């Protein structure tokens, strides 16, 4: 793989910057000969691995990981008519096995409800089997006809984490919805990705769900990116797939279900929100390497620099800080460029003067530089990593919230969504909501409990305390 050395386009041109960065930083190669299907570079995949291990650690507290087949028989996929209507024109079909036409066409999973729930029918017998909480991390396929974009809109989603739970009552399932939202909130906070949770409008909820809660973040161009969803399914799928349990009275009852998912869009959010004109800026929690140590050597006799670098690396690693030494035969400037492009949170420079002073030079990814004594170095670096993680989240959150504006007219909202999100009163009627979308040429993200207000619906004029968020979306 060739090492790129060119500079990136300005982030002000976000689309061009994003596409160039994915290749230059070796996150994802877009040159695979199928539209919307991309290849992870090893470095990009190391970020994916770190992020999804973090997600696994959160889920494994009270979920079990599993794996269901990718192929779904057509009759099973078509059982839930409302569900399949949501994406029937996006399904990939396998119609042949070798040269023989299959008696029953098989779908490549667009999502896994129709693969999982026939098995839940077999596995759930009594109230003692509940709650059942499973998840899997798999690839899914959608024949996207819109403009595809790596990590954001794909025909093969390579990293779809989907959890599926079953409960005795609707209220139990609702409690699980809130637990899932808490889990996702912790996950995105660890990624330093700010978000607002919206209850999707009725016409934009997950097909077959009672309601949908969505985690939305704002990309640098002001568009919203949906990075996670949590759905209360009620008994809709249980009735379709006959998933029942015997209660304490010996009577058969339908289970109530939830499902919730996150894809590699979470990594797109980290890249897009934090990156700069030098490359990636990774939160320490998401970076495979947290500190790179760079020896500064001026003569053939290194004056103990290499030995000092090795000592620092071992000291940091012994304290659970992921550090590496870059001892490649390159100028220090070339190494700075390389590790800045990779988004490494900190670099440590060690030269003869630092050894003499029993110190190291610590440089944060945003350029802040300070001399740090060797005494207590691991604790200092750990504190600096935490501080950087916190600063990234706070800066991103402040930037997002500063671009969410309450608007009084549709014309004002139309202007606002060019660079951010607009909020407006809404009566709650679908007809008014759709007219608002058409007038502003945007999407209604939904209602957020964190955004309060009151006013009159701009379409029908009714007084309301319901506030809707409007945005252009990926």
Curated annotation (Swiss-Prot):
Gene Ontology terms for molecular function: ATP binding; proline-tRNA ligase activity
Annotated InterPro entries: aa-tRNA-synt_IIb, aa-tRNA-synth_II, aa-tRNA-synth_II/BPL/LPL, Anticodon-bd, Anticodon-bd_dom_sf, Pro-tRNA-ligase_IIa, Pro-tRNA-ligase_IIa_arc-type, Pro-tRNA_ligase_II_C
CDD domains (UniProt xref): ProRS_anticodon_zinc, ProRS_core_arch_euk
PROSITE patterns from the UniProt entry: AA_TRNA_LIGASE_II
UniProt keyword list: Aminoacyl-tRNA synthetase, ATP-binding, Cytoplasm, Ligase, Nucleotide-binding, Protein biosynthesis
Biological function: Catalyzes the attachment of proline to tRNA(Pro) in a two-step reaction: proline is first activated by ATP to form Pro-AMP and then transferred to the acceptor end of tRNA(Pro).
UniProt domain comment: Consists of three domains: the N-terminal catalytic domain, the anticodon-binding domain and the C-terminal extension.
PANTHER family: BIFUNCTIONAL GLUTAMATE_PROLINE--TRNA LIGASE, PROLYL-TRNA SYNTHETASE
Protein name: Proline--tRNA ligase
Organism: Methanocella arvoryzae (strain DSM 22066 / NBRC 105507 / MRE50)
């Amino acid at each position: 793989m060739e090492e790129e050395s060119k500079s990136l386009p300005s982030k002000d041109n976000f689309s061009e910057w994003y596409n160039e960065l994915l290749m230059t930083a070796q996150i994802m190669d877009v040159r695979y000969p199928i539209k919307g299907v991309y290849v992870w570079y090893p470095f990009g995949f190391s970020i994916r691995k770190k992020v999804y291990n973090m997600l696994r650690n959160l889920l494994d507290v009270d979920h079990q990981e599993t794996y269901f087949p990718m192929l779904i028989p057509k009759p099973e996929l078509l059982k839930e008519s409302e569900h399949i209507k949501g994406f029937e024109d996006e399904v990939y079909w396998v119609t042949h096995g070798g040269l023989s036409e299959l008696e029953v066409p098989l779908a490549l999973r667009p999502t896994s409800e129709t693969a999982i729930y026939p098995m839940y029918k077999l596995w759930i017998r009594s109230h003692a089997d509940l709650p059942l909480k499973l998840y899997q991390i798999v690839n899914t396929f959608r024949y996207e006809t819109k403009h595809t974009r790596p990590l954001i809109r794909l025909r093969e989603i390579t990293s779809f984490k989907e959890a599926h739970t079953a409960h005795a009552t609707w209220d139990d399932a609702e409690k699980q919805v809130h637990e899932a939202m808490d889990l996702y909130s912790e996950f995105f906070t660890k990624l330093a990705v700010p978000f607002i949770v919206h209850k999707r409008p009725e016409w934009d909820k997950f097909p077959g769900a009672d309601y949908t809660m969505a985690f939305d973040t704002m990309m640098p161009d002001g568009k919203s990116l949906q990075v996670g969803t949590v759905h209360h399914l009620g008994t809709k799928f249980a009735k379709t797939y006959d998933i029942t349990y015997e209660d304490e009275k010996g009577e058969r009852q339908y289970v109530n279900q939830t499902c919730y998912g996150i894809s590699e869009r979470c990594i797109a959010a980290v890249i897009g929100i934090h990156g700069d004109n030098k490359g990636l800026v990774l939160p320490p929690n998401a970076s495979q390497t947290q500190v790179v140590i760079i020896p500064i050597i001026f003569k053939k006799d290194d004056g103990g620099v290499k030995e000092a670098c090795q000592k620092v690396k071992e000291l940091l690693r012994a304290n659970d800080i992921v550090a590496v030494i870059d001892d490649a035969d390159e100028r220090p400037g070339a190494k700075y460029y390389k590790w800045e492009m990779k988004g490494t949170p900190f670099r440590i420079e060690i030269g003869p003067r630092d050894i003499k002073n029993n110190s190291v030079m610590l440089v944060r990814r945003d350029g802040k530089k300070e001399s740090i004594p060797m005494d207590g170095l691991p604790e200092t670096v750990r504190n600096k990593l935490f501080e950087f993680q916190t600063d990234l989240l706070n800066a991103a959150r402040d930037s997002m919230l500063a671009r969410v504006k309450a608007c009084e007219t549709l014309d004002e909202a139309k202007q606002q969504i060019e660079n951010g999100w607009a909020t407006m009163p809404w009566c709650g009627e679908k007809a008014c909501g759709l007219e608002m979308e058409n007038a502003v040429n945007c999407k209604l993200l939904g209602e957020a409990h964190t955004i309060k207000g009151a006013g009159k619906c701009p379409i029908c004029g009714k007084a309301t305390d319901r506030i809707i968020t409007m945005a252009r979306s990926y």
